[in-house]
Amino acid sequence: RRDQILDAARTLLFSSGLESISISRISKQSELGVGTIYFYYKNKEEIFVALQKEGVTLLYSIIFQISKKDIDHGEKLIRIAKAYYKFSQEQKHYFDIINYFLSSPIVFFEPDLKNQIDMSGRKILVLIKDIVDEGIQKGVFNEKDTKKFSIMFWGTLHGLIHFKKLEKTILEKESHEKLFDYSVQKLIHSIK
């Protein structure tokens, strides 16, 4: 039944977006009673956490494949950035649910749920940090605090992706993707 609930929530997420998800709509979509859903999940945020983990797992698998390629470490970071950009466009609903957790100004999850969310995203930061660490060992990069750089790199990518919404206003006559690529190049250059 847990899978049935997540299938219904995923269907709603992909067909109507994050705002459309409610326990009553999940109940209707899954053909399960509201009480049954509450038996498995305390609230819709717990369902969001499960969907967020799916999205992060998918994104992680893409980034992991890039991290294992036998290419220059700077090129790995470029490809990771491009993969995240592509993910934000092609897996928009998963990106939206990941963003739901990152952009909320308040933490409204119980500590255990918050920890689950944070740990699922931490895996990606560890991959980036490992690439930078390896690049330092090979003399490609020069960075003293690889953890901070990895957080800055990922946070910058995430923020830049959100600037796509400004394409018709602030970024008028600018290609968002070119601005994104330019920024990634500058970030990587900063540690060479």
List where the protein language model places each region.
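Generic hydrophobic, amphipathic alpha-helix propensity
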Residues: 1-9, 26, 51-59, 63, ...
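Short, structured helix-loop boundary elements
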Residues: 2, 23, 45, 49, ...
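Helix-turn-helix
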Residues: 4, 12-46, 50
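Short, hydrophobic secondary-structure boundary micro-motifs
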Residues: 22, 95-99, 144, 169-173
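Hydrophobic alpha-helical connector segments
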Residues: 50, 54, 64-94, 149-153
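Amphipathic alpha-helical packing segments from all-alpha helical-bundle domains
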Residues: 57, 64, 109-138, 147-151, ...
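C-terminal peripheral helix-coil segments that are non-catalytic and often amphipathic
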Residues: 83-86, 126, 130-138, 159-166, ...
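Amphipathic alpha-helical segments used for helix-helix packing
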Residues: 90-111, 162-166
